[in-house]
UniProtKB/Swiss-Prot annotation:
The gene is MARF1. Residues 351-488 form the NYN domain. Residues 788-867 form the RRM domain. This is Meiosis regulator and mRNA stability factor 1. Keywords: Differentiation, Meiosis, Oogenesis, Peroxisome, Phosphoprotein, Repeat, RNA-binding. Residues 620-642, 655-721, 1678-1729 are annotated as: Disordered. SUPFAM superfamilies: RNA-binding domain, RBD.
Length: 1742
């Protein structure tokens, strides 16, 4: 620096800053306040000419004007020549400009001050540091205020003008703000930090500039007075608080202060004032002590130092003290900062923004944050924000928009969208409140187009004097526009906002409404829809079923209506509103995202990983990129070239584009995981300068896992493949991630559980993906653009569809907006639903929260479905992989693959979709067909045997022959091989002969394990006989053709835990399955092979192999004979290509769970595996045991029983073992058990004694089976469909343990009279028995004929109408008939055939009332006391003899009386059973046995009535035991009596309730038995006395008087029947006989002899004996020769039924009771008649 000087800069003072000695401290010369532009600033002698510059780069028009008051005080003072100050605008230099500290020396770190802002030597002059203060002349200099922090500044703005960037010129105006570049002075600027460390010389005191008269506290400059010499020290020790200058902002970024902020005469920028003070107030007493304080009485206010926006200081920054002179203390505002802010806000006019966001909504694809920012930038300058409010229905508005408004601190007022003008009323109220709160001047910004605001705007403008700014749409009314001061079109206002989504395309104005109630008339629904959409101008076009169509005048109205109407209630249904009809939703989804549906606002990306994209070069701004193909900032990521320093900086980064890059460079991408999950992502990057507009037309909602490259050329494919980034995702959404790939072409690994390691399936693991090409992903539609589908299963089918939809709507709406809820029909008895949510994040949250959430009585299963077009492809990819992974070499012919696919998944395959799965499969032309192959990158590691085996040791037990990764193994054991010169190359595999041995597995198994132990776990199969002979002796080998032996290789594989593997050199090796001995307690079944999962053709082939080999001798067949044997057995060719194989050996190796290949070379043998043999033997053994009557067989008799059952000799080698016990021991104990019985081993089926409850449940199950099969075609169904059908039909699970069984087949066998199990090959068919089939067919015929006119049908039309009614054809052969006429003969109890003129006609028979028959049969059964049960034939005879009419069940609709009785399950116990005499018998249930006792009890009472509260005691005394209703399943006596309505009924109320016997039960047909109590307590009488009658009823005591006509007995006073041998009145009265209660009846009797007896008594008669305990009248027949001397003897009082009288006298007809006495109006049943009308009631209490 040539102009640098070494003189102390503080030795002299500047002249114009120097005071006169005689002047007062507060007097200044105003002429010294301005520097003359004509004079140059004198410099030190070392200063060169280039330091002189007479031009100043400041124009007056660029400087804020000083205060008007101050300018008027000095009118005579000439201002400097402004024109001389002007100079051309000079572009800023790219070199950072710094300011010079005038108090510092020319330190090497200090740069010279450049005046004029020029970049060249002539454009400005440089002033060396220190030279400013050396001059003795009176010139002006300015000390800039800046930060002492030195670092490289940001690149300068390219459009900045020179007039806004002064470098260091002294200002002539005290209130102007100067630009200040960051200071590089390490000592800090003099007005900045006050702690100087290296100041040399004297410290200068800066005196305050005298204030203008009009503005006493105006800011001024301070002269540099004489500093006291000394060492550098703290300036603050010499400066008083009152001498601190007000803040002078010199920040170049703060020159936008228009109008300037004037605070008591000082000018501040708003940015500086908005910053809080960082330090406390400095002690005023220690600062500027020699300068008197200013003339003010107010406390100083601290103002933060303008340190440059966006920069930070290095330490404690000094605050500037500002004195106020208006006489108001700032302390009343609290802190000084609050006081300053309050003063500032008082001087700014308020502004309020009122936004009708439903009228002027945030445009699609734009952010609400950008709109709010635009409003504030446009209108808020010079104002203070007093109100910013928007009104909307937050449940209808986009949640992202609401969140953005909240983030912008905008008041969001919620209103009900369906209420008319709710938003307008709320805004009008807010406008009125604003006018009441604030006064003019104030500004109101209204964002709306509604004319309803015209009145409020008029008052605000004309009465309150507010400034009105109206932001409106094009269709605004003139009445509204007239009242605004400023008009701004809303479309223009937001037109240049950067779009974040594709621009909205024109669309229809129709809205489709779904889920309308079907039970309401169309007019009501139309009125409701019109009310919902009236505010938006909607019109209901038509209503069809559950949907409707509404029309709107424009798209905006339709969108508003969709928000308001979505999920609204219409007569109990939550409606679904859409722009597209349901039939076209799929097509619309596959088309462009912006064509048919409303483009949703951007969603916040909830990516748990933060993407840091580094070193991505800039793309050319002029690139003609299609939408989605340009450079784009990825959501949740930031782009920059420098290192990212903080997360806050990362969120503020912008995407940069260069202008010189012609070939974009491929950068390296990496995904790094932050320590915690972020619930929100960084804000979208704003539009960078020069970025093409097409870049913003992409869809940022696309969430691509692969980073999108900025290039669109396919040449760089290799570069992209090298660019990987790693992502961690929860394993539950692994398939979802695959669906979100940009393109399936670049997927590195498929999403399949077969090729992922366990740690990848069980936790979130990094998975590698290829970086996707931007041009590839941009063309495909966004999978979740139109919503995300959530699949729900395990729904409660008991709920109605409407309830399910409503419950799911409520549950899912708590986690986000639900677009639709759709229920699928019942498919395989599974009810499923699909809930469509608006975005992916809400769907994931719903899945996490609602999985296994209980709806109804079930816990739903929730899973996430993939989206839109990729949904079907992702599903197809998974389905394809599941098929091909089970195919040989992962390939199948196309036709075979198509067949397998359609059979497995039940829907057609579109072959063209296979060509789209380029990352999963490849379709190759092979010969005359095409081959579908799984790509190596997608398939799991396959062993040579196919996918059923894996290479880990834990699953190598899938086959006895396993190809394992044994690199090499010796073909023989060198230790025990007799041929020491054995050469592997000379060995001929065809020469190997398979040995057949006879060994017990019980002995052989431990020997094999011991042999493996001594041979380190492996023994070559060729040397196994030699090694075994060396250890245990020679094997017992038999000839193959002689039989009786088992192949040694097969017997080895029968040992649990041992297998035979094949090394890579083809040598078979005997080894342990897990390369170690099995644990001693291991279940052998855990060590067996397992069936393959997948290919149904291979499963069918395995069944055929079993069927073929079990018919071969010893189940062994040479491999060369397999094809001819197959052809002969199945009468069809075994086409290997049909299964996708090219060689037979490959097909045979594909079923290792059933087929074992023995030997080697061309002489290999085929046999069944031990697992298949055990399963086969188990089935045969169960069939054998079930054929036995006792379900068991003695081991010694097993061979004979086997021969009887299967018609062939028993040979244990047929099942691959040598002893029966070897294979029986393999069967689980729950299937077969061995027991000892009389020193004999017994094989039996384990049977648990079922409880009575289980038996009862089984009976009910049989009824359920009948009900279920009656709904099936032909009353039959497949065995494997029973469980799902039962679950669907009855709504409950069929639990076998509930019935006491462990297998379903056993349960079916327990109901053989109901169900038959037919075996058709491998399939089982369930069908009803013949009797049940006819009963079901009869019910169908009744239904069919009743639906016809006149209940008849022509015989020729029967089969046709049957098929039409029931949906399937009628098969006569199922009923063993050949014609309909023969069928009607078997259904004679239902239909009859009538000959008509037109032909034979089938008619329903007229059935008799079954109710009356039921009552009659019940009376018979209750009257029967002979035995506990009664035969059906005897019951029929008894009925016919009693009612003198034949009992024909066909008249009642039943084929037999047995079937009729079975239809009365509540009356008849066990329905109908067979006794020892093979007779069908029947007995009453326990409940009706109780009813029988109740009937007998009520018969002992007058009128057969009894009070309810006395019933329990009377019953207990009558029966002899306490009545317990709970034993019958009831909680009270009243409920128990109510369960037998056929017997009794209860009438009355309260305590007057009476138990009354039904009229049908009053007839005493054969009431011959005694009471139960007497029958139990008294000894039996001699049989000849107590005879059980066979036919007519016996004589009984008859009470009552009256009759239909004259009768001789009416004249009797008291007598017995004619055959009575005893005079009762003359006999001694028994002591147990109580006195009767005689109540005279007021009937006038004729005079007669009251005591007249017969002269000639008859032989037998009846006496009435009262039971001593129960006091019940019991008629007992007495014969003369057997009459005891004491009538009270036990023999006489025995309570047994009495025989009828042998007299030839016919029993008299029963007499009628007086109608006034008995409500029953029935004839009396007593033989003993009283002349007087006495009520003979028994005494129950003594």
């Amino acid at each position: 620096m040539e102009g640098s000087g070494t003189e102390n800069p503080c030795s002299t003072t500047v002249g114009w800053l120097q005071q006169d000695n005689d002047a007062k401290p507060w007097l200044w010369r105003f002429s010294n306040c301005f520097s003359r532009p004509q004079q140059t600033l004198p410099l030190s002698p070392q200063t060169k000419d280039y330091m002189e510059n007479k031009k100043v780069a400041v124009e007056l028009k660029d400087v804020p004007s000083p205060l008007h008051a101050g300018s008027k005080l000095f009118p005579a003072v000439p201002l400097p020549d402004i024109h001389s100050l002007q100079q051309p605008k000079v572009q800023l230099s790219t070199v950072p400009k710094v300011s010079c500290c005038a108090h510092c020396t020319n330190d090497p770190s200090t740069s010279p001050v450049r005046f004029g802002g020029g970049s060249g030597g002539g454009a400005g002059s440089l002033v060396p540091p220190g030279a400013l203060l050396d001059s003795q002349s009176t010139r002006t200099i300015t000390c800039q205020v800046g930060s002492g922090l030195a670092f490289q500044s940001a690149p300068p703005l390219q459009n900045a003008s020179a007039r806004n960037t002064l470098a260091g010129v002294a200002s002539d105006f005290p209130s102007m703000c100067l630009e200040s570049n960051l200071s590089s002075c390490k000592h800090l600027p003099c007005c900045g930090k006050l702690h100087f460390q290296s100041c040399r010389g004297n410290v200068h005191k800066l005196h305050q500039f005298p204030a203008l008269q009009g503005c006493p506290s105006s800011a001024g400059y301070f002269p540099c007075s004489d500093f006291t010499s000394g060492a550098p020290g703290h300036v603050e020790e010499h400066v008083s608080q009152s001498e601190l200058t007000p803040h002078l902002c010199t920040n170049s970024l703060h020159l936008n202060v228009v109008p300037p902020v004037c605070l008591k005469g000082s000018l501040y920028c708003e940015d500086c004032l908005s910053k809080p003070a960082r330090n406390s107030i400095i002690d005023a007493a220690k600062v500027w002590p020699n300068i008197p304080p200013p003339n003010t009485q107010t406390a100083p206010v601290t103002v933060p130092l303008c340190n440059g926006c966006g920069t930070k200081g290095m330490g404690k920054e000094t605050t500037l003290l500002l004195a106020t002179s208006l006489g108001k203390a700032a302390s009343k505002f609290g802190s000084p900062e609050v006081a300053l802010a309050g003063q500032m806000l008082e001087n700014l006019p308020p502004i309020g923004v009122f936004w009708d966001i439903e009228n002027c909504s945030v445009p699609s694809g734009r952010s609400a944050t950008a709109v709010v920012q635009r409003i504030r930038e446009k209108f808020f300058k010079g104002h203070r924000e007093a109100e910013f409010i928007c009104v909307c229905d937050i449940s209808k508005e986009n949640k992202e928009v609401i969140q953005e408004l909240n983030n912008c601190q905008v008041t969001v007022a919620h209103i009900n969208a369906t209420a008319k003008n709710a938003a307008d009323d709320k805004l009008r109220q807010s406008l009125r409140r604003f006018a009441n709160t604030h006064t003019a001047p104030a500004t109101v910004v209204l964002v709306s187009t509604d004319v309803n605001f015209a009145l409020e705007l008029s008052d605000l403008r004309h009465r309150h004097g507010f400034h009105i700014i109206l932001v409106h749409k094009n269709q605004a009314s003139e009445a509204l526009l007239h009242h605004a001061n400023e008009l701004i079109r809303f479309e223009e206002f937001i037109s240049d906002l950067p779009p974040r989504l594709p621009l909205k395309m024109p669309c229809h104005t129709l809205l489709y409404v779904y889920n309308l109630p079907a039970n309401k008339d169309g007019k009501s629904i139309s009125n409701r829809l019109r009310r919902l959409s009236d505010n938006c101008g909607g019109k209901v076009l038509n209503i069809t079923g559950c949907s409707a169509i509404l029309r709107f005048i424009n798209r905006d109205s339709a969108e508003r209506a969709l928000k308001r109407m979505e999920n609204e209630d219409v007569f109990g249904n939550r409606i679904v509103v859409s722009f597209t009809p349901k039939s076209s939703e799929l097509c619309e989804t596959k088309s462009s995202n912006a064509t048919a549906d409303k483009v949703k606002s951007p969603k916040k990306l909830k990516n748990p990983k933060l993407c840091l994209i580094k070193d991505i070069s800039e793309s050319p701004s002029s690139a003609k990129a299609a939408p989605g193909k340009g450079s784009q900032a990825n959501s949740g990521s930031a782009t920059r070239n420098a290192n990212v320093k903080s997360l806050q900086e990362l969120c503020r980064l912008e995407s940069k584009t260069g202008t010189r890059s012609s070939e974009p460079q491929q950068g390296h991408l990496r995904l790094g995981a932050p320590p915690h999950r972020s619930s929100s992502a960084a804000a979208p990057a704003p539009k960078a300068p020069g970025l093409a507009e097409s870049v913003y037309k992409t869809n940022p909602k696309k969430e691509s896992l692969g980073a999108r490259s900025v290039t669109s050329s396919p040449v760089e494919k290799k570069e992209k493949e090298e660019t990987l980034f790693q992502v961690s995702y929860p394993s539950a959404f692994s398939k979802l991630i695959a669906s979100r790939q940009v393109s399936p072409l670049l997927t590195a690994q498929p999403w399949s559980s077969r090729n992922l390691s366990p740690n990848l399936l069980n936790r979130a693991s990094p998975l590698a993906f290829n970086a996707a090409h931007s041009s590839v992903g941009a063309d495909g539609p966004d999978p979740f653009a139109h919503g995300v589908d959530v699949q729900i299963s395990n729904l409660d089918y008991r709920l109605s569809r409407k309830e399910l939809q409503q419950l799911m709507q409520e549950a899912f709406s708590r986690h986000g907006k639900v677009k639709s809820v759709e229920l699928s029909p019942h498919t395989d008895y599974q009810l499923k639903a699909v809930v469509q949510m608006e975005n992916l994040q809400e769907a994931i949250g719903a899945v996490n929260s609602l999985h296994r959430y209980k709806i109804g009585s079930k816990k739903i299963l929730v899973s996430l479905a993939t989206g839109a077009a990729n949904k079907s492809l992702s599903l197809l990819s998974a389905e394809t992989m599941s098929i091909l992974q089970d195919a040989p070499a992962c390939c199948l012919p196309l036709f075979k693959f198509t067949d397998i696919y359609e059979k497995k998944f039940g829907h057609r395959l579109n072959v063209s979709d296979l060509y789209k799965l380029t990352d999963t499969v490849a379709i190759r032309e092979q010969g005359n067909g095409r081959l579908v192959c799984l790509l190596p990158s997608s398939q799991a590691r396959q062993s040579p045997l196919g996918s059923s085996q894996s290479h880990d040791g834990s699953s190598t037990n899938c086959s006895p022959i396993i190809f394992e990764e044994l690199e090499y193994h010796e073909p023989v054991c060198r230790q025990h091989c007799p041929n020491k010169d054995f050469s592997e190359h000379e060995f001929d595999p065809d020469s190997y002969k398979i040995p057949f041995v006879i060994l017990s597995l019980k002995t052989f198994a431990p020997q094999v394990h011991s042999l493996l132990q001594t041979h380190e776990g492996t023994v070559p199969l060729l040397s196994f006989p030699d090694c075994y002979a060396a250890e245990f002796g020679e094997l017992e080998i038999v000839q193959e053709n002689r039989g009786g032996g088992v192949p040694l290789e097969h017997l080895i594989t029968c040992v649990p835990g041992v297998n035979i593997a094949t090394a890579q050199n083809g040598v078979k090796v005997v080894k342990w399955i897990h390369n170690k001995p099995p644990p001693p307690n291991t279940d052998p079944w855990l060590l067996r092979s397992k069936s393959p999962v997948g290919n149904p053709q291979l499963i069918q082939f395995s069944r055929e192999v079993i069927d073929l080999l079990k018919n071969q001798p010893s189940c062994v067949i040479p491999i060369s004979n397999f094809i001819p044997s197959y052809h002969h057995h199945f009468a069809k060719q075994c086409r290997v290509s049909d299964y996708g194989y090219s060689k037979l050996i490959e097909l045979l190796e594909a079923v290792p769970h059933v087929l074992q290949i023995l030997g080697m070379g061309s002489k290999r043998l085929l046999t069944l595996t031990h697992r298949a043999q055990v399963k086969r033997f188990t089935q045969d053994l169960l069939k054998l045991l079930k054929s036995q009557a006792s379900k068991q067989v003695i081991v010694k008799e097993f061979a004979q029983a086997y021969h009887w059952c299967f018609s062939k000799d028993w040979d244990v080698t047929e099942y691959g073992v040598c002893e029966l016990i070897d294979i029986i021991s393999e069967i689980p104990d729950t299937t077969i058990c061995l027991s000892q019985q009389d020193s004999e081993a017994m094989i039996c089926i384990p049977r648990r004694e079922r409880t009575q409850d289980e038996i009862e449940r089984t009976k009910q199950f049989s009824k359920d089976v009948v009900d279920l099969l009656r709904h099936q075609p032909h009353f039959r169904m497949p065995f494997n469909k029973f469980i799902p059908s039962y679950h669907h039909h009855f709504g409950r699970q069929c639990k076998l343990a509930y019935y006491g069984f462990t297998k379903l087949l056993e349960l079916f066998e327990a109901i053989p009279d109901i169900l038959q199990v037919l075996e058709c090959g491998e399939e089982k068919i369930l069908t009803l028995t013949e009797v049940e089939r006819f009963k079901a067919l009869a019910a169908q015929f009744v239904k069919l004929l009743r639906s016809q006119k006149d209940n008849c049908l022509m015989m020729t039309d029967l089969l046709k109408e049957y098929a039409k009614t029931f949906g399937y054809t009628f098969r006569l052969q199922d009923y063993d008939v050949s014609s309909v006429s023969a069928l009607t003969q078997k259904l004679c109890h239902v239909v009859k055939v009538a000959d008509m003129e037109s032909g034979k006609q089938i008619q329903l028979i007229n059935r008799k009332s079954l109710r009356a028959l039921t009552a009659q049969l019940l009376v018979l059964l209750m009257s029967w006391e002979g035995t506990t049960h009664l035969s059906v034939d005897e019951l029929k005879r008894h009925y016919e003899s009693t009612h003198s009419t034949p009992l024909n069940p066909c008249e009642y609709g039943f084929m037999t009386l047995t079937e009729l009785l079975k239809s009365l399950p509540y009356l008849v116990e066990d329905q109908v059973f067979t006794n020892d005499k093979t007779e069908e018998c029947v007995k009453l249930t326990s409940l009706y046995l109780f009813a029988k006792n109740v009937r007998s009890l009520l018969h002992t009472y007058h009128y057969q009535q009894l009070f309810l509260h006395e019933f329990s005691m009377a019953y207990s005394k009558y029966v002899g035991e306490t009545l317990q209703p709970k034993t019958y399943g009831f909680s009270s006596v009243e409920e128990l009596l109510g369960a037998i309505p056929q017997v009794v009924w209860i009438k009355g109320h309260g305590h007057k309730r009476i138990v009354v016997l039904k009229n049908d039960m009053k007839s005493r047909v054969n009431s011959l038995g005694p009471s139960p109590a007497s029958h139990e307590t008294q000894p039996s009488a001699p049989e000849r006395i107590l005879e059980v009658p066979e036919s007519p009823p016996a004589s009984e005591l008859r009470l009552g008087v009256g009759g239909d006509g004259p009768h001789p007995a009416e004249q009797e006073l008291l007598r017995l029947t004619d055959d009575s041998p005893v005079d009762l009145l003359c006999a001694p009265v028994p002591s147990c006989l109580p006195s009767p209660q005689l109540r005279p009846d007021p009937v006038v009797l004729q005079a007669a002899d009251l005591i007249w007896f017969e002269e000639h008594p008859q032989e037998p008669s009846e006496i009435m004996i009262l039971n001593q305990e129960e006091k019940i009248e019991i008629p007992v027949p007495i014969r003369n020769e057997n009459l005891p001397p004491d009538p009270s003897s036990p023999g006489v009082s025995a309570a047994v039924p009495a025989p009828p009288s042998p007299s030839s006298e016919t029993p008299e007809s029963l007499l009628s009771k007086d109608p006034t006495e008995s409500p029953a109006k029935k004839q009396p049943k007593n033989r003993v008649k009283l002349a007087a009308n006495f009520s003979f009631a028994p005494i129950t209490k003594l």
